[in-house]
Each structure stands twice: as C-alpha cells, then as structure tokens.
C-alpha cells in the first residue's frame, strides 16, 4: 500500500479538484495523524525513474484498508470522505502538485507525462473514492430526503469519471499489467453501481460481470493470501448480479437472493434495501391468490394485504431461521420476523373498531366464539408470542453453553445463572399471555399443551435458581429446589402422552432429570464437606485471621486470599497513632511579682465646670 509522510498543518488550497468532496473535517488531524502514507512505495524508490520500469499500485488493497481504518467499518461514509480529502491534500503537497493557492484556483490534471511516480495514480484514485463515499453518504440520507437522490447520482457519475481517468492513465506502457487489470475492474465496479441506481439492469449486469471476471482471474494468478481480497470482492458483487438477473427476467435468481439473507450480516451496500423490497414485492404478488387461513380447526378469511404478505412469508422466515449459520444471523432474522408480525397485528387492530369489538365478539348466539377478525388477531398474536419464546429459548441455549465454558478473559463479565432466570421469566410470561388469547378459552387441547410447556420452562427456571443458591453455598435451599425440578419434570413425562410431538422442539426434560440427579449428589457431598470443615477444631493454620499480613508474620496461616487481587497485606489507609506534641509553658511566677507604684508619674486629672464644658465644645480646651 502506498504510504504518506506526515505533513504539518492541514490547510492550503490543494485537493479542491474533487467537486466539494472534502467538506467535513478537511483539515482535521492532517498534521496530527502519524502515518507514512505519502512516502513513495517500494516499487518506485528512485527519484528519477527510467521509463522502462513499471509503475505498480495495489488499488483494491489500498481502498479496502483505507475504508476499514477510516469509518466504513461502522458505515461512516462522511468520515471516510474527509479522510480522502486530507490524503489528497497531503499527496499534492508531497508531489508539489497543488491546485493554485488559497486565493486562486488553478486546475491541473494528471497526464501520462507525469507518470514517474505511482502516487500520481493514487491521487486520481482518491478523487474517485471521495466522490463515491459522498454518494454513499447521500444514499443513507436519501431515505428521509428524496431530493438528495439527484445529488447522489451526480456524485456517482463523478466517481465513474475519475475511475475512467485512472483506467486511461493505467493504459500507459509505464504501468504494469496487474495495475491495468485492477483499474479496469474498479471502473467496471463503479460503472455497475451507477447503472444499478439508474435501474439499467442489463448495463449494470454487464459491468458487474466484467468486474467479477477480472477479479476471479487475478485471484487465480496469485497466492492464496493475495487471492482472499479478490474473492471477497467477488462475493460482494454476486448479490448485485443476481438481483439484476431477476429484474431482467431470470425468475430462478430469487431463490439465490433469499439464500443470501442467511449469511451473517446479511447483504450490504446498494442491494440491502432493494432485496427487502423485492421479497416484499414477490410476496405481494402471491398474496393476491391467498384468501383464507386455517388454524386449530377453524378457517378465517384474510382480507388485509399486509397480513397476507406476512402469512405467505411465514414459512420462508422459519426456514431461514432454521438454516441460519450463526447466532447473529439468527437473532437478526428473529427480530425481522417479530417486526413484520407487529405490523400485521397493528393492521388488524385498525380494522377492529371498538364498537365492532363489542358487537362482533359473539356470533350466532354462541358464547365464546369470537369474530373472524378477532380470531385472526389471536392467531397473529400467537405467532408473535411463539416467536418471542423461541428467540429467548435460543438465547438461553447460548448462555448455557457460555456458562459451562471457562471464560478466556477474566476482565470480561461471564454469564451467571441469574441471566438465565430472567430469560425464563419472560418465557413464562409469554405463555401466560397465550392462555389468555380470545377464542381459545374452550380449547382444552391448547390449554393442556401450554400447561405442559409451562411446566418444562418452570423446571428449567427452578434449576437455575438452584444453581444460583449453590454458588452462595445455601445447600438446603438448593436441595429443595432440585427436588422441585424433579417434580415438574416427572409431571411433564407422565402427562405428555399425545402432546409429545408439540413438545419435541422444547428442551429435553429427561436430560434435565439426569443432570439434576448428578447435581444433587455433588451438592450433598459439598454440604457434608462444608459441615465437616466447620466442625473441625480451629488451628492456627485454619483460622482465617482478619489481621493484615504485615501484623502476622510470626504465624503460619494458609490464606488463599493472599494470591487474589483483594489480598489483605497492610492497613489502608493507615490508622491514627498518638505522637508527642510541642510542650506548653505557663509563666506561674508572674502572678507573684509585685510591681512598683506609678501614681507619681501619672498626670492628675483636674475637674472643670461649665466653663470647661463650653470651651470643649468650641475647641478652646487645651
């Protein structure tokens, strides 16, 4: 990757030729960043390069490393655009290729005659990257401000223009073959993105296919380490190609696009929102043929389009969750499904007017039979609560695995049994809400099934409460709770009968019974050892002395706390100790000293009458 020297300051008028791309933080950190990005790469270390030598530039590696280090790891395109502007300015200053000064702009173009240093190619590449990052920033903002889409397309065209300029420069004989191919692939990629935004599917797929072909050839021509970057770019392009193929008329592409949702992190870039819209559009077409749904022996009509779309995608969503490769993907799919379900429930609620609720709650004089719309609402609520239970159960499984493993980093907080107790509390609350659904009060099979599920999760909740008591050595409480777990589990085994199919997706209670029996044996042994330790005569080596170590050097004591972070070594802060103070001296002889009289030395005060008083008023008194 090309490197830059540290350039002090950050001002200057250079780098203004990219069309306003450096507006955010143009001078921020230009002098404070400690990097070597502007140094001449190893391929061109001589100052006076002979024309027979080849210039080389790792285009894909440079942009990928820059993007990951300057904002795109978190989707911050504005930060990356500012970085491109600052790097351009540093390159122009290093190469003495400034666009005039702060008072006057003088446009300069990189020509073939200047290609004595690959940093001139890097300068054009940063122009294209700056325009592209600005376009992606505008794409994020265009969701709320549609007018910014026109500016987005303008920036993409600018990026393609700079990429074409880079490709033209790389056609020079001074540039090696690999750089030429990378420049062609980069131009094809940006061109495909522009056509994609214009919805010119045929031109877009041609550009993406060209880009994919070049990167595949480059990946096959180099070592595995170098090929990883090219293969990663090919994977990024593939969803765009399938989406374009679907819009051209390839109906089989929709299945591959659906599978792409199962990848960890999902699709990104231009395709993320378009893929979701495509799936919704496909389901909307299928929803036109859906008129009713059957649940627990009752068929109800479905007239709300949003509900039809959700119910049609229900099976696909459940299959996607089952096939998810990672926990992050599974959690994302759970959240997406719950969000769609909440929207469908809200659409049904809007149809359920308060007066219609009261009027339609009973039909044909049959008490307990709710209206079709209310029953549909109960069905959607059942789906939402069941999905929430499955999600929390999946989270509980992950916490159980983490609880059984030793933490690799002691500084990180490891999971505790209390975390699992909270999850099972939420699950039990969801089961209580299921029992209260309108229209299912007289469904004995449903009530029995939910009752058995409640017992299963109560058993697991009780088990982890017992585990938390074991940690604080409350043996009797833990033993009672283990017995309660066995009671719940035995009730499930005895009453399951015909409901075993509905309970097969739940945690195995037989495995829980085996684990509880093992834990009870360990608990009883630990309780006996603890009791025997407490009854042993206390010796100097067994008594835990609260004195700090500095005060008991003469006594041998096995104190495990001395090797922990809370070792009691000294008193801190130190206690107060009495110290001698400065003595006080009292002059006792002074009380017995007789001083000579002073009456003869004091002036006798003479009495004055009214005359003296008047003189004193007017100031004549001497």
From Swiss-Prot:
Record region (RNA-binding): 1-231
Domain of life the protein comes from: Eukaryota
InterPro entries: SRP68, SRP68-RBD, SRP68_N_sf
Annotated CDD domains: SRP68-RBD
Keyword terms of this UniProt record: Acetylation, Cytoplasm, Endoplasmic reticulum, Nucleus, Phosphoprotein, Ribonucleoprotein, RNA-binding, Signal recognition particle
Residues modified to N6-acetyllysine: 448
Protein's UniProt name: Signal recognition particle subunit SRP68
Taxonomic path: Eukaryota, Metazoa, Chordata, Craniata, Vertebrata
């Amino acid at each position: 990757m090309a490197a830059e020297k540290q350039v002090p300051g950050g001002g200057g008028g250079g780098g203004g030729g990219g069309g306003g791309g450096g507006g955010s933080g143009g001078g921020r950190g230009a002098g404070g960043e400690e990097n070597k990005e502007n140094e001449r790469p190893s391929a061109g270390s001589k100052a006076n390069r002979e024309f027979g030598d080849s210039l080389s530039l790792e285009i894909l590696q440079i942009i990928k490393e820059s993007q990951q280090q300057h904002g795109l790891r978190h989707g911050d395109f504005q930060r990356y655009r500012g970085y491109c502007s600052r790097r351009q300015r540093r390159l122009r200053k290093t190469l003495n290729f400034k666009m005039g000064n702060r008072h006057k702009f003088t446009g300069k173009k990189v020509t073939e005659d200047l290609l004595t240093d690959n940093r001139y190619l890097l300068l054009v590449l940063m122009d294209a990257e700056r325009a592209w990052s600005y376009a992606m920033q505008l794409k994020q903002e265009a969701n709320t401000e549609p007018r910014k889409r026109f500016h987005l397309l303008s920036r993409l065209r600018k990026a393609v223009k700079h990429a074409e300029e880079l490709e033209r420069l790389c056609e020079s004989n001074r540039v090696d073959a690999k750089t030429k191919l990378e420049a062609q692939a980069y131009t094809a990629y940006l061109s495909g993105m522009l056509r994609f935004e214009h919805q010119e599917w045929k031109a877009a797929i041609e550009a993406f296919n060209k880009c994919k072909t070049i990167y595949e050839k480059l990946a096959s021509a180099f070592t595995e380490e170098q090929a990883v970057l090219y293969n990663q770019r090919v994977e990024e392009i593939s969803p765009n190609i399938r989406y374009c193929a679907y819009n051209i008329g390839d109906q089989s592409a929709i299945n591959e696009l659906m599978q792409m949702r199962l990848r960890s992190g999902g699709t990104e870039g231009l395709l993320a929102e378009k893929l979701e819209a495509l799936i919704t559009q496909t389901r909307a077409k299928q929803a036109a043929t859906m008129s009713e749904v059957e649940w627990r022996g009752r068929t109800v009509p479905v007239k709300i389009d949003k509900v039809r779309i959700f119910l049609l995608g229900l099976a696909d969503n459940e299959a996607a969750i089952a096939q998810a490769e990672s926990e992050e993907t599974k959690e994302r799919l759970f959240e997406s499904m719950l969000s769609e379900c909440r929207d469908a429930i809200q659409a049904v609620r809007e149809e359920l007017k308060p007066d219609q609720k009261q009027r339609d709650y009973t039909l044909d004089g049959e008490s307990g039979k709710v209206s079709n719309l209310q029953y549909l609402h109960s069905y959607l609520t059942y789906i939402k609560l069941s999905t929430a239970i499955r999600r929390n159960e999946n989270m509980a499984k992950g916490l159980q695995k983490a609880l059984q493993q030793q933490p690799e980093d002691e500084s990180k907080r490891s999971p505790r049994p209390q975390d699992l107790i909270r999850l099972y509390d939420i699950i039990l609350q969801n089961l209580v809400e299921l029992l209260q659904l309108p229209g299912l009060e007289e469904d004995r099979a449903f009530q029995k099934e939910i009752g058995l599920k409640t017992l299963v999760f109560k058993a697991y909740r009780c088990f982890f409460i017992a585990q938390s008591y074991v940690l604080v050595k409350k043996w009797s409480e833990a033993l009672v709770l283990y017995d309660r777990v066995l009671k719940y589990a035995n009730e499930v085994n005895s009453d399951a009968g015909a409901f075993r199919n509905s309970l097969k997706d739940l945690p195995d209670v037989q495995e829980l019974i085996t684990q509880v029996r093992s834990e009870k044996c360990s608990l009883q042994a630990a309780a006996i050892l603890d009791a025997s330790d407490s009854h042993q005569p206390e010796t100097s080596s067994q008594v835990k002395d609260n004195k700090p170590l500095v005060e008991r050097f003469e006594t041998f004591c096995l104190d495990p706390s001395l090797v922990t972070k809370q070792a009691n070594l000294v008193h801190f802060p130190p206690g107060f100790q009495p110290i001698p103070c400065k003595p006080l001296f009292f002059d006792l002889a002074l009380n017995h000293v007789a001083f000579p009289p002073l009456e003869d030395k004091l002036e006798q005060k003479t009495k004055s009458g009214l005359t003296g008083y008047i003189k004193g008023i007017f100031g004549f008194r001497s």
